[in-house]
């Protein structure tokens, strides 16, 4: 959901049709697995949040909140995802070792470069872009 824009709903078929990347990483004490998924920045672009130009001004304070079915949430600053700034690789994966995700899916968020998988989100149900550029203080 992007403020001021209609919500974008992606079903498994639509996600499967988008360009995928592969990474080999492990979570916790598990053996490394091959994961396939769509870059979060591609999903954001489809929702009208383009990162193809460097972020400036208020946009630097905006963030992406990812929520799981159990209400677990993680946040990424748009600047973290911007290719000219943090360029953090974040994937919405739909397969592991060549098989569709079962209990962790249908979509799971992975951050392959993180030293521990605390920002990996199972059963993603929502991705929101929040304008953090307000000058109002609580």
What are these model-derived regions, one by one?
Residues 1-138:
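N-terminal intrinsically disordered, low-complexity segments enriched in P/E/S/T
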